[in-house]
């Protein structure tokens, strides 16, 4: 049997959506966590800790909540949009769950076990340099040596990585927004909802940007045709699986988002939620009763990069196409072009971590 999503983790996640006994019991620890986070952030802003300024604009895509909000598809969409705008973006990520001794380039032929599932997905979906290492500043500097033509950096999931100065911050949420609005461990927040940012991006198909909420934009994930894992040349619409016995499996931060999208396409799948970044070293389908009974097994692109060794014609991969409000794309493009210098110099380590262009900060709360 596969490793199930941890019962304790599911319990805590559910508690984070309300202000019940758990939230109040954890509140003293949240106050301490908030104090430490505030001191750390202000310490970088005031120059108490060293940070690195790159010779190019840095756009950060991250979240103030724990868990997946759709950052990877957002980075993919932004990389594609900036490339279409004539810019030359590069992407730096941490490489979650991978032990790295030095910065490593992610190629489309890389293995997820060597570079991480999300960076590999970005590398395969875009034609931009992608590098991984926990020290994002060093990683970016190393990338620039190999790719000196890069003139804008996308920092994947680096909102709290203040060692690298930034020029534009995007804070992402999904339909869960900020939960109960409390900091860890009483709630899901790493930082307060009121944290300043340049833009708020809501990954929710029902969200609509309106003039009374400036700085807030929407993103939706549209299902593309599914392709067969054993033979990627085989493709068909997801709706073609309607009426079949379908098992949907997902090892992502919010599996229910994937399951709901399949239901929206007319499917009634059995579901198998797996831990985020599940490594698929053990085959979760080999003795699972719903898998044994299924005609079709649907998985995400993020999981597919770790399932390539599986030889099961029932497994189909469901890609998603991220669509971001054009207003955010244009706002980022203007901010980036305003920062690009004609003759960049070598990156340098300087005191002070904010390094942010306050002209673009709107301070818009998320909720």
Curated annotation (Swiss-Prot):
Its EC number is 2.7.1.130. It is an enzyme of class 2 (transferase). Pathway: Glycolipid biosynthesis; lipid IV(A) biosynthesis; lipid IV(A) from (3R)-3-hydroxytetradecanoyl-[acyl-carrier-protein] and UDP-N-acetyl-alpha-D-glucosamine: step 6/6. It catalyses: a lipid A disaccharide + ATP = a lipid IVA + ADP + H(+). GO terms for molecular function: ATP binding; tetraacyldisaccharide 4'-kinase activity. Keywords: ATP-binding, Kinase, Lipid A biosynthesis, Lipid biosynthesis, Lipid metabolism, Nucleotide-binding, Transferase. One of its GO terms (cellular component) is plasma membrane. Residues 343-355 have a biased composition (Low complexity). Residues 356-367 have a biased composition (Basic and acidic residues). ATP binds at residues 65-72. GO terms for biological process: lipid A biosynthetic process; lipopolysaccharide core region biosynthetic process. The keyword ATP-binding applies. Residues 343-367 are annotated as: Disordered. PANTHER family: TETRAACYLDISACCHARIDE 4'-KINASE (PTHR42724), TETRAACYLDISACCHARIDE 4'-KINASE, MITOCHONDRIAL-RELATED (PTHR42724:SF1). HAMAP family: LpxK (MF_00409). Transfers the gamma-phosphate of ATP to the 4'-position of a tetraacyldisaccharide 1-phosphate intermediate (termed DS-1-P) to form tetraacyldisaccharide 1,4'-bis-phosphate (lipid IVA). Belongs to the LpxK family. This is Tetraacyldisaccharide 4'-kinase.
